[in-house]
Amino acid sequence: MPLDPEVRNFLQVYYKANIIDFTKYQFQEIRQKVNELLAKAVPKDPVGETRDMKIKLEDYELPIRIYSPIKRTNNGLVMHFHGGAWILGSIETEDAISRILSNSCECTVISVDYRLAPEYKFPTAVYDCFNAIVWARDNAGELGIDKDKIATFGISAGGNLVAATSLLARDNKLKLTAQVPVVPFVYLDLASKSMNRYRKGYFLDINLPVDYGVKMYIRDEKDLYNPLFSPLIAEDLSNLPQAIVVTAEYDPLRDQGEAYAYRLMESGVPTLSFRVNGNVHAFLGSPRTSRQVTVMIGALLKDIFK
């Protein structure tokens, strides 16, 4: 279908502003500008309660935010990993999404402020997210959640971390109830139809931020073939948590996300895959669509947690 007029207007304003311009700005300035843009992308809803704390890891204290819904009907938990090409984003940039998700799922949500590249290279972010899941399971009683009802949710690079931690959880015999990778990066694919068609002019440009983000995140080219970076090429995708995979029509990552869903199905993993037409990567420029998609995901997870 045609590009949503609201999204088209957003793209015109976004490219005119030229936020990601390394001839004008230093990286830290770009990080700040993009984070400010993302934080305002969707209006924030009230929730029952939010609580900020830090998880003590072996060498680091990992910030998290715990969201309680206005109305709780189940003791499930959704672990939320934000997007941002592994180099951008924070709890704040997807605070609105966490709030919508908590209220629509009617359960607790924990958003994880994992460490970013280039300060911290792959696989630091993966293990930050995985360790947050382990911490939540170990503290299920205090959190008021069922340790056997934990789902993961993430957008873009967050979707990559969802898929990667699903592999880690399976291999470490840690049960997850569901995985929800939304417009995920699961493989550095430069040859697909969607990658070629939407590689420039649809927000997620291939040179910036995709290629730049990848180069800042990985340690060397060997990481490109590590399943924790490229879950799509993992030899075995069986026995992973059931999946809800969401893609966007005008997104260069669309085809790889749908290929991941197909491989999950082939591997016997119960999988629901749907494409949001008329929208770009992460539904930027359409707060209405972003809200609708998040509410639908929350409703599906609520049903899974029953």
UniProtKB/Swiss-Prot annotation:
The active site is at residues 156, 251, 281. Optimum pH is 7.0. SUPFAM superfamilies: alpha/beta-Hydrolases. It is an enzyme of class 3 (hydrolase). Completely inhibited by chemical modifiers that are specific to Cys (HgCl(2) and p-chloromercuribenzoic acid), His (diethyl pyrocarbonate) and Ser (diisopropyl fluorophosphate and phenylmethanesulfonyl fluoride). No significant effect with chemical modifiers specific to Lys (pyridoxal 5'-phosphate) and Arg (phenylglyoxal). Not inhibited by inhibitors of A-esterases (paraoxon) or C-esterases (physostigmine/eserine). Activity is also not effected by incubation with 5 mM divalent cations for 30 minutes at 30 degrees Celsius or with 10 mM EDTA for 60 minutes at 75 degrees Celsius. Changing residue 281 to N: 5-fold loss of activity compared to wild-type. The keyword Hydrolase applies. GO terms for molecular function: aryldialkylphosphatase activity; arylesterase activity. Keywords: Hydrolase, Serine esterase. Its EC number is 3.1.1.2, 3.1.8.1. The keyword Hydrolase applies. InterPro entries: AB_hydrolase_3, AB_hydrolase_fold, GDXG_lipolytic_enzyme. Belongs to the 'GDXG' lipolytic enzyme family. Monomer. Has a broad substrate specificity. Hydrolyzes various p-nitrophenyl phosphates, aromatic esters and p-nitrophenyl fatty acids in vitro. Most active against paraoxon, phenyl acetate and p-nitrophenyl caproate (C6), respectively. Also has tributyrinase activity, but shows no hydrolytic activity toward other triacylglycerols including tricaprylin, trimyristin, tripalmitin or triolein in vitro. This is Arylesterase.
